[in-house]
């Protein structure tokens, strides 16, 4: 058990594939983060927040949390809409479970110590050429402003540093989403600048603030 920002971090470590040189390694293309998929029974904990890989059985809780949080999520999450359904949840989860096992993206459920679903946090949009990825996160409205997202970002970052060959994790946030920007800052990410018209949300282009965490 290692100390992480004054909280405790607990996990079962997955194997690490070393970074590879050269341009035509097909196994690297299939596993762009350089992460081995032989041990996915990972649980990470910081204080009263736990991150674990998603399971398809999480679909009902995700759907409930999304509808509870529509007002807050819709402006900033392109996948969020009033007709979000259990089928949408299941389809997304099926894809993410496969992506996690293949080392293509790593989405985690944020849960309380008693197992209640709080939100999601993941390492995705992975580009192996420059060994970079993106961290995305959201928390259901009833759990906002309690440090849940900040703890989740810290855990996801440490997991990526210990279990993949990525050297840079970006957090891209719409300029108007000040709450998410505060999470990035509290998690220790560095604000690098504003990218014009970088995010398209519900068919509208938005300027975005770029934050980063590096190895």
PLM-predicted stretches and their roles:
Residues 74-94:
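Conserved GNAT-fold acetyl-CoA-binding loop/helix
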Residues 76, 80, 103-107, 167:
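Short, polar/charged, Gly/Pro-enriched helix-capping and turn/loop motifs at alpha-helix termini
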Residues 1-61, 65-72, 107-215:
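Acyl-donor (CoA/ACP) binding surface of acyl/acetyltransferases
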Residues 67-70, 81, 97:
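Residue-level detector of secondary-structure transition/capping positions
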Residues 98-103, 189:
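Short loop/turn motifs at secondary-structure junctions and domain boundaries
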Residues 56, 67, 83-90, 104:
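Generic alpha-helical scaffold signal
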